[in-house]
Amino acid sequence: NPKLRVLIGDGMKFIRETAERFDLIALDLNDPMGPAEALYSAEFFQQCRHALAPGGALVLHIGAPVARPERVAELAQRLNGIFRIVRPYTMYIPLYGAQWAMAVCSDKLDPKSLTADEIDRRIEQRKLQDLRFYNGETHEGVFALPNFIRDLVNPPRLKQQARGRRLGVVRAAAK
């Protein structure tokens, strides 16, 4: 696809210096150790946000929720402090033999607002029928998070609101 451009190099330097705006920034990063640690910083995510075109999205893996739950929670919290919409999702990664968490981050694009029918229609329009994994149902499915992952990725204010609603129901039932 002529719209696709793959850039390999110093991501921090590139994102800091570019004046371009991107519809999508997909980060396939090393673990956040050593030199790669800066690529997981709030500063870098802010710079990525600035490099997005209106309606654009940043997509990245946020870790293995079973093996490193603290990393998933930390990154989700950091991203929620920068982007208006952060939608974590999970999938099994055969290479690692584990479920991994990713996130779509944007100020306008909400991938959960797309229905299975809309996804299937777009796949058909773009003549992508040979896809082996992705379809409308898998789109909806990857965003259906198990409770233990929800607990990791929900920002504290949402947890407080949810807890308040539950307590309100309990109080009302007790009266």
Features from the language model and the residues they span:
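Short acidic/glycine-enriched loop/turn segments that link adjacent beta-strands
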Residues: 96-99
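Short, solvent-exposed coil/turn elements at secondary-structure transition points
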Residues: 12, 92-94, 108
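The AdoMet/dcAdoMet-binding core of the Class I SAM-like
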Residues: 1-57, 67-71
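SAM/dcSAM-binding transferase cores
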Residues: 101-175
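Acidic/polar loop patches that form or flank catalytic/metal-binding clefts of enzymes
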Residues: 60, 85-90, 112-116
